[in-house]
Amino acid sequence: MNSSETTICALASGVCKGGIGVVRVSGPLCKVIAKKMLGFVPKPRYAHYGLFFDQENDEIDKGIALFFPKPHSFTGEDILEFQGHGGMSVMCCLLESVISMGAKPADPGEFSKRAFLNGKMNLVQAEAVADMINANSKRASKSAFRSLSGEFSNQVNALTKSIVELRVFVEATIDFSDEEIDFLQFEQVKLKAKGIKQAVETILKSATQGVILREGLNVVIAGKPNAGKSSLLNALTQESSAIVTDIAGTTRDVLKETICVNGMPLNIIDTAGLHDSDDKIEKEGIKRAHFEIERADVVLMVFDAQDDKPDFSILPKNIDDQPLLLIKNKVDLISGAVKKEMINNIVQLSISAKHSKGMELLRKELSDIAGLEDFSEGVVLSRKRHIIALEESLASIDNAIMQLENGVVELMAEDLRFAGQFMGSITGEFSSDDLLGEIFSSFCIGK
């Protein structure tokens, strides 16, 4: 059945006990349900206080009812809301009554999906609804609100328009190549294409920061057994997240904690000590450690200050492109000072995790790697799919410039078409049903 023909309902206030609970209904049966449960259809956008009735006309609760007629509602459909006492028993009775009158339980994100399909918001704004709910810092929530307000969408739409306009012009040169029309010269076309490329690169940089702001920077602590990795995790999180003993190999699995530095989430991941082992459990822990190291945004290579230097042979071989910080731990044992220095073009921090010395120095270094100092107030929360689309669009624009330089105008127009499609996929202008299903299935029910 088409979504516009069905009526959906959900507990919009979440599955928890509270002072107030909200049941949200959207679809063509809203007026019918209102007449049965209230005895009348509420005046649009006015709060009505009264009794709620079930299918048998028995009283369920007393509260506030709101009616938003289409198209002036969140979903673009008729919307009815019941705001009652937040006990789960009361809310379940309200939901059961609404369902008995023809509504069906909403799927995760179905309200937002209908809002998107009915043109009430684009895909970026729909995603921002979920990001507002899941934001884990003040900075993240502010950035999500900017996306919800259309800031990111407007940037993408402006670029998409520029790409389309350039493609239309290039195609016109193909269609009317034999006629005397005053077209821009070669260098002007190239200049415009490079201007678009530069604009995409700027948005890509901001979006990359937005992904970090949304998902956090994955920081993996690696090193030999008893190097002080777990002590470092505890010092960074300021909690006893990991067991610390003098026995080497205490940590055999992966431990994960999230902290915030200046509003930026950092996912700190402690791993098993890296060394040769015949122990089956230790070997599995080392295997998992290698997996985390290979997918890390930054690796903290921890080694004992009593050793001459870190042993890089214990690290996986294919991490050359990943940021690496050398952490010279236990400097208190050699009467060393907390400091930062460069060792073979790699930053090395001398610290004492046990005594929490040098933690501010480490937090500052992690902030720099994440680009925190470069974060402007204009950064919006982004997703990895946005990054992929921007990178694909950028590659297509590069190809278009190359085709122009080679004099193959037809292929330039085709590459510009691809660039526009990749950009359009961000806001949902060009999106498959599979993509929409994947995006909205991650939402909570009632949104």
Curated annotation (Swiss-Prot):
Official protein name in the record: tRNA modification GTPase MnmE
Gene Ontology MF terms: GTP binding; GTPase activity; metal ion binding
Record organism: Ruthia magnifica subsp. Calyptogena magnifica
Cofactor entry: K(+)
Enzyme Commission numbers on file: 3.6.-.-
NCBIfam families in the cross-refs: mnmE_trmE_thdF (TIGR00450), PRK05291.1-3 (NF003661), small_GTP (TIGR00231)
Localization per Swiss-Prot or TrEMBL: Cytoplasm
Lineage: Bacteria, Pseudomonadati, Pseudomonadota, Gammaproteobacteria, Candidatus Pseudothioglobaceae
HAMAP family hit by this protein: GTPase_MnmE
Binding site for GTP: 226-231, 245-251, 270-273
Function: Exhibits a very high intrinsic GTPase hydrolysis rate. Involved in the addition of a carboxymethylaminomethyl (cmnm) group at the wobble position (U34) of certain tRNAs, forming tRNA-cmnm(5)s(2)U34.
Root EC class: hydrolase
Family statement drawn from the similarity comment of this UniProt entry: Belongs to the TRAFAC class TrmE-Era-EngA-EngB-Septin-like GTPase superfamily. TrmE GTPase family.
Segments forming domain TrmE-type G: 216-371
Subunit structure: Homodimer. Heterotetramer of two MnmE and two MnmG subunits.
Record's signal peptide: none
Alphabetically ordered keywords of this record: Cytoplasm, GTP-binding, Hydrolase, Magnesium, Metal-binding, Nucleotide-binding, Potassium, tRNA processing
